[in-house]
């Protein structure tokens, strides 16, 4: 005894490195990248449940650290250091004020926050989150303070409309169930284009006071699945998540919208079925709980190790906690532990998980956007939405004859400015600098007219954008006309003898002249007609002559003129295709991965898949058997045949006849 009194127990530091408090978003920050915010962790030690006195296996050192007996070495203790430690005599008020209350302010800034209660079964998680009427827990205290904050913000005269809504769900045996509407069944977890996690179909109840919250929350809490085990008479058999959404809408320009979410999560405790004696449905529930908590540990380890893939999708729990761990939320993890020695292994496991969790880094940011009505597109008249030719036809004869260019140009330019206003609202400052340089250059050359920068910025950008679009449209029309002229000239340059040897069904129109009408206003393409039968030869590639009539409407004449036009189409004989298919099948069965990569639409991955399938199942009976290879679909096989049969058939023949 004297030796032990003189020799102090050795202490092993466990997770002693602690960083500073998490930083919130800085309003005047220059960098657009969200600041880092570490997951803050707290440990709460519940009192003894039994009357029998026994020495505890956990002892608090100060407000941030504790020590646990080391079962491997009797004279050593394991020391843990966290952001906060609440001992046996700590109250619900101490836990709430010390860890949870500071993060509520972030919700009014449009940021997310999460509070998770973690620990083994019977450690007091539900008591910490819910409490009792005499000692309310985190959830009722947080809702009471949050509603009070919204009332204070509204009373200060800020130009924001604030609304609060709640949702309540549980994850029971990997099923997401709505506690506010138990008849809704299993819900799915989705992710939007911005990476936000959402649950379509989840009931949302607006609340304006704490009494309204109790009216919805208390009946829903009775829908949660609980059961009795040897270690806990009211053991939670599911993970419960209370989601509180705070929406703010600005009444004045620029009509911003902010959304902050608060996740209050009561996790089910991990269980040792040898000690709990679970059987039947309890055993199945315990397996689902332990599996989800195991995946939760894998997610924390992957985040700490910086792995490229984080296994969020391996369980419904981690999928829902994707924003809380490694996401954009201010997260608080409250680990609940028991002092009894029979919970020693569970306590060590919970403390180790908590120590790893405090190294997880989140990046909170403000969820702010413009309200939908502020982004509504400007509705243009029907004539503004039509093209130049259609707009001209849409006009009446009186409107077309009496309208002046000056009167029609002004509405068109105004509508173009309005339609492009939203697209150019966030123009790059570098573009403005280029415009300033352009104006100085025009001024030095003696340019006359209205200076470019005398107009407002947004209208100036709209004008420049409109001019660029018109120039591009003119260039496209010029290129299209050149292509049409070149096509007609190439058809006229065909050998007359070849034209005579080619039988045609369509007779040339007598009214069609050899010259090309320069101003083409409208072209109507008639259905194709086949004009040459397939040759009896079965070992060649043939050119089939195709023809169609085209109506040309002259800008000077109202009558339409029909013109016969010819073009050529390739047709391959069936025997040549059969030889190409045979060669392709031989290459698929005998060729190496390098030979397969020489084919069209076959890369390194597909070549390896084909070789592997061939080694397992033997040679292909036909080319269409590629559909049986995992990773190659029927459409891919069809495009593969089209791309390779023509090239293989052409390689076996010198050319068309």
Swiss-Prot record:
The modification Phosphoserine is found at residues 404, 419, 444, 537, 554, 573. There is a cross-link at residue 457 (Glycyl lysine isopeptide (Lys-Gly) (interchain with G-Cter in SUMO2)). Residues 16-33, 402-415 have a biased composition (Low complexity). Signal peptide: none annotated. Pfam families: HHH_3, Kinesin. Interacts with FAM83D and SIAH1. Kinesin family member that is involved in spindle formation and the movements of chromosomes during mitosis and meiosis. Binds to microtubules and to DNA. Plays a role in congression of laterally attached chromosomes in NDC80-depleted cells. This is Kinesin-like protein KIF22. It comes from Rattus norvegicus.
């Amino acid at each position: 005894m004297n030796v032990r009194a003189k020799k102090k127990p050795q202490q092993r530091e466990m997770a002693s490195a602690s960083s500073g408090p998490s930083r919130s978003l800085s309003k005047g920050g220059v960098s657009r990248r969200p600041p880092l915010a570490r997951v803050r962790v707290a440990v709460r030690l519940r009192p003894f449940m039994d009357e029998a006195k026994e020495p505890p296996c956990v002892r608090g050192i100060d407000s941030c650290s504790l020590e646990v007996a080391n079962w491997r070495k009797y004279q050593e203790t394991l020391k843990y250091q966290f952001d906060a430690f609440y001992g046996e005599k700590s109250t619900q008020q101490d836990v709430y004020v010390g860890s949870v209350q500071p993060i509520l302010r972030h919700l009014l800034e449009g940021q997310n926050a999460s509070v998770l209660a973690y620990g083994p079964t019977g450690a007091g998680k539900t008591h910490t989150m819910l409490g009792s009427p005499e000692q309310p827990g985190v959830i009722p205290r947080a809702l009471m303070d949050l509603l009070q904050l919204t009332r204070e913000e509204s009373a200060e005269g800020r130009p924001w409309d604030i609304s609060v809504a709640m949702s309540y769900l549980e994850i029971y045996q990997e099923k997401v169930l709505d506690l506010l509407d138990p008849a809704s069944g299993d819900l799915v977890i989705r992710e939007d284009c911005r990476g936000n996690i959402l649950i379509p179909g989840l009931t949302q109840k607006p609340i304006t006071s704490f009494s309204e919250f109790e009216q919805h929350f208390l009946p829903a809490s009775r829908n949660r699945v609980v059961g009795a085990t040897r270690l806990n008479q009211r053991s939670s058999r599911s993970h419960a998540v209370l989601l509180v959404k705070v929406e703010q809408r600005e009444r004045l320009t620029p009509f911003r919208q902010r959304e902050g979410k608060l996740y209050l999560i009561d996790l089910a405790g991990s269980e040792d079925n040898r000690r709990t004696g679970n059987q039947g449905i309890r055993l199945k529930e315990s397996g689902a709980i332990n599996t989800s908590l195991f995946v939760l540990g894998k997610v924390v380890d992957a985040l700490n190790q910086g792995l490229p893939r984080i296994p969020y999708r391996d369980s419904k729990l981690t999928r829902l906690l994707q924003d809380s761990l490694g996401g954009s939320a201010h997260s608080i993890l409250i680990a609940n532990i028991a002092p009894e020695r029979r919970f020693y292994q569970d306590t060590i496991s919970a403390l180790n998980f908590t120590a790893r969790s405090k190294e997880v880094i989140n990046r909170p940011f403000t969820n702010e956007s413009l309200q939908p009505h502020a982004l509504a597109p400007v509705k243009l008249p029907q004539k503004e939405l039509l093209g130049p030719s259609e707009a001209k036809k849409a006009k009446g004869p009186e409107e077309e004859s009496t309208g002046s260019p000056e009167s029609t140009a002004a509405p068109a330019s105004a509508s173009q400015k309005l339609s492009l206003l939203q697209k150019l609202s966030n123009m790059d400052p570098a573009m403005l600098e280029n415009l300033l340089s352009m104006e100085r250059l025009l001024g030095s050359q003696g340019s006359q007219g209205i200076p470019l920068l005398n107009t407002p910025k947004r209208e100036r950008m709209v004008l420049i954008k409109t001019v660029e679009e018109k120039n591009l449209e003119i260039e496209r029309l010029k290129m299209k006309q050149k292509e049409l002229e070149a096509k007609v000239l190439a058809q006229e340059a065909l050998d007359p003898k070849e034209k005579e040897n080619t039988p045609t069904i369509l007779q040339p129109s007598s009214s069609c002249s050899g010259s090309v009408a320069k101003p083409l206003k409208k072209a109507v393409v008639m259905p194709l007609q086949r004009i040459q039968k397939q040759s009896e030869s079965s070992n060649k590639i043939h050119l089939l002559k195709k023809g169609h009539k085209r109506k040309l409407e002259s800008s000077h004449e109202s009558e339409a003129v029909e013109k016969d036009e010819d073009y050529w189409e390739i047709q391959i004989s069936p025997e040549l295709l059969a030889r190409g298919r045979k060669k392709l099948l031989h290459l698929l069965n005998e060729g190496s991965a390098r030979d397969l990569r020489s084919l069209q639409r076959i890369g390194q991955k597909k070549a390896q898949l084909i070789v592997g399938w061939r080694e397992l199942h033997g040679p292909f009976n036909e080319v269409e058997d590629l559909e049986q290879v995992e990773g190659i679909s029927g459409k891919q096989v069809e495009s593969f045949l089209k791309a390779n049969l023509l090239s293989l058939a052409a390689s076996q023949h010198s050319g068309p006849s």
